[in-house]
Design a protein with these regions (language model features):
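HTH-adjacent hinge/linker in prokaryotic transcriptional regulators
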Residues: 1-55
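Short, flexible segments with low predicted structural confidence
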Residues: 17, 35-36, 60-61, 108-109
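Amphipathic, non-membrane alpha-helical segments in soluble helical-bundle scaffolds
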Residues: 31-35, 127, 176
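Short helix-to-loop capping/linker segments positioned immediately adjacent to catalytic or ligand/cofactor-binding
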Residues: 48-52, 60, 72-73
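Glycine-rich phosphate/diphosphate-binding loops that line cofactor/substrate pockets in enzymes
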Residues: 55-68
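Glycine-rich phosphate-binding loops that contact phosphosugars or nucleotide phosphates
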Residues: 65-175
Length: 176
């Protein structure tokens, strides 16, 4: 126990304070960029571990496992990681979609039913497509897994599972 406590204290002491919005600038050396990105990843993982509720994660995993199809709804800079997750689902034999256009997302929502599971990724909960898509999914009894900040969860209560992420990043003043 003592060894583990010392290890954890040492790791915490080695974490560097990094500006999450601007971890580096034009004057940063490659070594500084690497060091700051390491600090950023460590901070992100630690915060995610603190915020993520294991019961919600388990619920989300079970919903995905039993779903006939998983549809991912997101936009902007979240499209690439969402597409990567879709590809992993497809590789595992799970039918999945992730469309970039709002029109395709709306049509997918309209074609969904309780056999689908929707994963909605919006850290702020303010993504423009949500105003149209969430009521459709709700009316069609589609279980919705929300990936977002605590604010997003408060803004959109009543869904099947919430995977909460940090809200330290500025929505308007950052490197994207």
């Amino acid at each position: 126990l003592k060894v583990e406590l010392i290890r954890l204290a040492t790791e915490a002491g080695n974490r560097r304070d990094v500006d999450i919005n601007f971890p580096f600038d034009a004057t940063s050396t490659p070594a500084q960029v690497m060091e700051r990105m390491e600090g950023l990843y460590q901070t992100t993982l630690a915060e995610t571990q603190e915020l993520l509720d294991p019961a919600q994660l388990d619920r989300a995993a079970k919903l995905i496992a039993k779903a006939r199809q998983v549809d991912i709804y997101t936009g902007s800079h979240n499209l690439y990681p969402a597409g990567m997750f879709r590809d992993r689902l497809l590789s595992s034999g799970k039918s999945a979609t992730c469309y970039s256009s709002t029109e395709a997302q709306v049509r997918t929502a309209l074609a969904s039913d309780s056999g689908n599971v929707a994963i909605v990724i919006s850290y702020s909960g303010l993504a423009p497509n949500l105003k149209e898509i969430l009521p459709i999914l709700s009316s069609r009894h589609v279980p919705v897994i929300v990936i977002g900040t605590p604010y997003c969860a408060r803004l959109h209560p009543g869904f099947a599972a919430y995977l909460t992420v940090s809200d330290h990043e500025s929505m308007t003043h950052r490197i994207t």
